Design a protein with these regions (language model features):
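Amphipathic alpha-helical segments at domain termini/boundaries
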Residues: 4-7, 50-152, 160-174
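Conserved mixed alpha/beta core segments that line enzyme active sites in large multi-domain catalysts
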Residues: 156
Length: 174
């Protein structure tokens, strides 16, 4: 989606409007962000914030995305072009904290416990698959590993059902 595409950029500028929302809703569709989405989110936000953001599946306003490190700058829509032209002058953003394998193992247990309160793995395997994938690979930039993990979820009956629900709800909004 759009957020994953933006995450591939070195610098992200978001418009400061009440309707600007930045999100990775894939978990609600029974999959998780692949194709570098997981890696790039961790790289920007750090492991803990990135996983909480991805596991929620909920979009965040631009100003919160700025505080979390997901975007680099938030400007009024009328200033987007000028901000893009001047982006080289902007201070380099700090990298998110990336955890080692021992820390990931510890945090994975805590994340699974939190997810278990909200989602039964029989019906919502994606959050558990995301945690397991992250625990194993961390912020390793390997699109092939991400693609394989996401594809196995994409082909599942749970994901097909969640995607159908999404499309039905989306159709009701129109």
């Amino acid at each position: 989606g759009g957020t994953e595409l933006a995450l591939m950029c070195d610098y992200i500028i978001a418009a400061d409007t009440k309707n600007t929302r930045i999100g990775l809703p894939e978990i609600q569709l029974g999959i998780f962000p692949g194709y570098g989405g997981l890696y790039n989110t961790i790289k920007r936000m750090g492991d803990f914030n990135a996983l909480n953001f991805i596991l929620s599946g909920k979009p965040m306003p631009a100003k919160i995305a700025l505080k979390q490190g997901l975007v680099d700058q938030v400007v009024m829509p009328s200033g987007l072009l000028q901000a893009a032209v001047n982006f080289q002058e902007f201070v380099k953003r700090p990298k998110g904290r990336i955890l080692g394998s021992k820390s990931r193992s510890f945090l994975a247990v805590a994340l699974r416990k939190e997810v278990e309160k909200k989602a039964d793995p029989r019906f919502y395997p994606a959050p558990y698959a995301l945690i397991d994938h992250w625990k194993t690979f961390g912020a390793d930039e390997n699109v092939e590993k991400d693609s394989i993990a996401v594809q196995s979820l994409f082909d599942s009956p749970e994901a097909r059902g969640l995607m159908r629900c999404f499309h039905l709800q989306d159709g009701l909004k129109k």
